[in-house]
């Protein structure tokens, strides 16, 4: 008898970004470290995600046909997993009913009590606004709530928080998610480059304007494009970062990088505002008029206020300790053994 087998079911691409699939891989890394066999089942994941999965010893299975419904779940079941971990808002009731009909144990990663699941063995909400009352309809499920369970990729965890460096100009990273759905990278980079900073611009693997962004950055003297293979190191080496308000918020907090978090989707509102209250990010609604001007002003104010920046660094390191993925893995193992351990 081989090791237990967990299947991560999550999608990523230009329309929905890469947050769901990347944080699912962080869960997978935690389970691999505990001796599990892990695979990712996805529909249309970009090559960069598949490389990340391979580097983490996580296999990949392509889901064909319509994603998120009963037919999708039937394909999942044929892989014979011991546990399915589902992350995404498009998985409907027929998807979960199919899993239940096959008596397939499943857990869900959720943000705002939007999951359509009815009988998960475990629910993970890694956001600081998460409360047990949001999941009262799952009385038998293990609940993992809050930043104690923040999912950090191994590449980030292995770098760890660094010491601040004295620089002539502060280094600023711009990283608006895997796909930049509101097309903010170019406008924000142009505004931020007007400040006396060393600007680094990340281009997400699902960003459809990658070549245009690269060409624009080449025209700016104090800007350069980030090598995607060194993204985690670039984030860790940054003095400040302007980022999409998704899971990168937790990575930057752990690494001690003060951030300006741009809300680019409705499902980020509650989590990013709670993070703002926690003190390690300054949130801006990227859907509002002229977010690039607001981001430039916020960045300028942060650079000019070292006491505030230091407080944000301390708040981030206090809030995210880097052990979330392992805690989630241990809790999943316990839930499969029938021993709920709510956190």
Give each language-model segment a name.
Residues 117-182, 204, 208-211:
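A nucleotide-sugar donor-handling region in carbohydrate enzymes
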Residues 161, 166-238:
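Donor-nucleotide binding loops and adjacent catalytic segments primarily
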Residues 308-322:
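A short, well-ordered alpha-helix in the C-terminal region of glycosyltransferases
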């Amino acid at each position: 008898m081989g090791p237990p087998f967990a299947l991560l079911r999550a999608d990523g691409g230009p329309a929905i970004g890469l947050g769901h699939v990347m944080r699912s891989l962080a869960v997978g890394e935690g389970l691999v470290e505990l001796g599990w066999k892990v695979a990712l089942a996805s529909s249309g994941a970009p090559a960069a995600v598949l490389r990340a999965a391979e580097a983490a010893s996580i296999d990949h299975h392509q889901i064909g046909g319509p994603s998120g419904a009963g037919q999708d779940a039937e394909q999942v079941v044929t892989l014979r997993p011991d546990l399915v971990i589902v992350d995404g808002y498009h998985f409907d009731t027929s998807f979960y009913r199919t899993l239940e009909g096959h008596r397939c144990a499943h857990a869900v990663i959720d943000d705002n009590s939007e999951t359509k699941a009815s009988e998960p063995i475990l629910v993970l909400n890694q956001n600081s606004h998460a409360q047990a009352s949001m999941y009262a309809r799952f009385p038998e499920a293990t609940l993992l709530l809050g930043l104690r369970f923040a999912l950090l990729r191994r590449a980030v965890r292995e770098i760890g928080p660094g010491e601040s460096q004295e620089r002539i100009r502060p280094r600023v990273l711009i990283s608006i998610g895997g796909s930049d759905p509101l097309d903010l990278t170019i406008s924000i980079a142009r505004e931020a480059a007007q400040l006396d900073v060393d600007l680094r611009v990340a281009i997400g693997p699902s960003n459809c304007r990658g070549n245009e962004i690269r060409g624009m950055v080449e025209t700016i003297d104090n800007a350069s494009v980030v090598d995607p293979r060194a993204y985690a190191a670039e984030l860790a080496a940054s003095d400040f970062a302007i980022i999409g308000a998704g899971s990168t918020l937790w990575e930057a907090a752990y690494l001690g990088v003060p951030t300006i978090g741009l809300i680019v989707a409705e499902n980020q509102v509650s989590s990013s505002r709670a993070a703002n209250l926690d003190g390690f990010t300054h949130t801006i609604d990227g859907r509002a008029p002229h977010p690039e001007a607001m981001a430039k002003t916020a960045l300028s104010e942060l650079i000019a206020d070292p006491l505030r920046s230091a407080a944000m660094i301390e708040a981030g390191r206090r809030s995210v300790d880097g052990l979330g993925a392992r805690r989630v893995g241990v809790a999943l193992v316990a839930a499969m053994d029938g021993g709920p351990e709510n956190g």
